[in-house]
Amino acid sequence: GLIVFGVFGMALCQYTYFRSIALAGAGIATVLQYLAPSMIIIYLLVRYGKRPSKGEMVSVILALVGAICLMGNGDGLSIESFPMAVLVWGLLSAVGVAVYSISPVDLLYKYGTLPIVGFGMLISGIVAAILFHQPNSYAVWDVWTVIGCFNVIFLGTIVSFNAYLEGVKRIGAVPGSILSSIEPISAAFFGWAFLGNEFSLLGLIGMAMIIATVVIIAWDRQRT
């Protein structure tokens, strides 16, 4: 379970997501990754016969459409020069999210979130070092490079993975993966705060849809 989580969950998701961004930009890569909740629902239905609730189905649709609207807020989502290869990488990133949402659940209950995430990162790091070893680096290391690496490693990986999987342990893979769709809102907010990006009506509609998923999931859990 831990090997599957580290290799086909964390490592696969991280590499394919950044690969998608490199090919088509963050907008399309993010939207494709948010197909993961649908994949999780299909897997649980086929494997365990677990039918999704009406709230979960509505939330999946709202989260995906909301992400599309939000990523299309400015110039973030464009299919004019859309390489078909990004479809493969984007779907693989969604598979990675589905795998790391489902595979470690029993381990999380048994050992806790932090040890599982730590060993998962260790395994994925070893795999990455073997497959993508680069003895020579051409990166220009300055203060901004260090800050960027810190943000990606600590905030974007360590904190986010631990918070996400703790949520999955508490409420389950489907609602946890749906609620993670709040990520595009934070990206849009920081883009507005630090980069001067503006919000369009489409972007605000997308935000409202994503926030609605939080309300629906909370209401759905109170009913069950």
Predicted segments with their positions:
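Hydrophobic transmembrane alpha-helices of multi-pass small-molecule transport proteins
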Residues: 52-74, 128, 181, 190, ...
